[in-house]
Amino acid sequence: MNYDQMLERVRKGDGFIAALDQSGGSTPKALKGYGIDEGAWADEQEMYALIHDMRSRIISSPCFTGEKVLGAILFERTMDGQVDGQAVPTALIEKGVVPFIKIDKGLEDEADGVQLMKPMPELGALLDKAKALGVFGTKERSVINSANAAGIAAIVAQQFDVGRQVLAKGMMPILEPEINIKSATRAECDTLMRSEILKHLDRLDGDTQVMLKLSLPVVPGTYEALVDHPRVLKVVALSGGYARPEACAELAKNRGIIASFSRALLDDLRHPMSDDEFSGSLGTAIDEIHAASLT
């Protein structure tokens, strides 16, 4: 698939986007959930090798195909690695799965109720490398913890600023201003953020489009104006700490939004499983998340 074919695939295809982009800070937790305890690796290199093996097992599984998985978001080290002797983005594309790369470098300390993204001084080089490997788009995460209008305005502005840099390289940005589902002012956060996003969408040039990755809203349908906006290619939802049944139930209440789940996709996978058990468990998760993404 070339860029235009991947664009059409994301625009019109059924399915969801698998989030396989745990970075250094969240890798030990992901491995523990997979059944590998922290003492199993001697250094960071071995830790990353173990998480790469887990991701390789997912990507090479017979049930992980473009039939139900529209795309996959990768951590940089995963993008640079191989699956069954192929570069990971190439392996995904051959399965009909559109590759994305996580580009943010973590979060700043909270200010004005939000956590902005840390600076990304090497963003240009990362985008050039990713594009050369056939990667279609990017994903960048920041976090909203409370309904502070100034903080939310700043977080959305930063997301669009970085998104423009991605667009300038001929790639598709997924903007992810995540709302903490434990926030006491979550519903107000939803509406404040929606208003800020709409302002920035209306300022985009010509037929430019972006993607949005958002927390599931308190009130179903809150993001329909974003789903229907001509400057939005697709709205995807993170599971945000919900277990899979709850995440799928909440997602199904929101027309036009598809899943981009990590924990809710990977929760039941365990390292000691046989390949058949692993594929069976992964296949069940894929089926459930795919079904919830069709509403």
Each language-model region and where it sits:
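Alpha/beta catalytic barrel-like cores
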Residues: M1-F136, I144-S146, C189, E196-L214, ...
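Eukaryote-skewed repeat-based solenoidal scaffolds used as protein-protein interaction platforms
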Residues: T138-L212
